[in-house]
Amino acid sequence: MAKLTKIIAVITARSGSKGLKNKNILKLKGLPLLAYTITAAKKSNKINRVVLSTDSKLYAKIGSKFGAEIPFIRPKKLATSKSHHPDVVSHAVNFIENKEKIKFSHVVMLQPTSPFRKAHHLDMAINKFLKEKNNSL
C-alpha cells in the first residue's frame, strides 16, 4: 500500500517558447523567471514537494539550483506547443507516485510566468481549496 504524501507542486517549464525565446529563464531583477515560482512553492507552508517538469537540461540545472526536484527530463511528446498542461502534470505525478510507491492527496500546477505570486498567495489558495472542498481552483 502506498503511503500518503500531501501536496505536490508541479512547475511546468517548456524550453521551446515561440513568442519569447527561453522566457522561463530570462532574468528578472537578476534571477531567472522560474526561480520566483520555485522559491514561492518552497516557502509555502502547504506544499510538501516541488517538482520541475521540463524538457531542457539547462532549465533542470537552474531549477535544481533553486531547490526544485528534477526526477526526469520531460518526454518530447509532452514538450510541444500542442501539449496540454493536464497531460504534463499527470505525467509528473504518475512518474513520482509509481517510482516512489507514494500517493499525493492534492496537486498544484504552477507556471513560471507568474513571478509575483508569493508563498502566502499559494497558501491562501490551497486553504480556500481545502476549506470549500472544491475539485479545482
Which positions does each model-derived feature cover?
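Hydrophobic/aromatic residues located in beta-strands of well-ordered beta-sheets
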Residues: A9, V50-L52, S136
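Short aromatic/hydrophobic "clamp" motif used to bind/position activated sugar donors
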Residues: V107
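Short, well-formed alpha-helical segments that are part of the catalytic scaffolds
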Residues: L20-K43
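Catalytic metal- and UDP-sugar-binding loop of GT-A-like glycosyltransferases, i.e.
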Residues: L110
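N-terminal nucleotide-binding beta1-loop-alpha1 segment
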Residues: M1-K21
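Conserved N-terminal catalytic core of the sugar/cofactor nucleotidyltransferase
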Residues: T37-K103
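Conserved donor-nucleotide/metal-binding helix-loop-beta segment in metal-dependent transferases, i.e.
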Residues: H85-D87, A92, I96, K118-L137
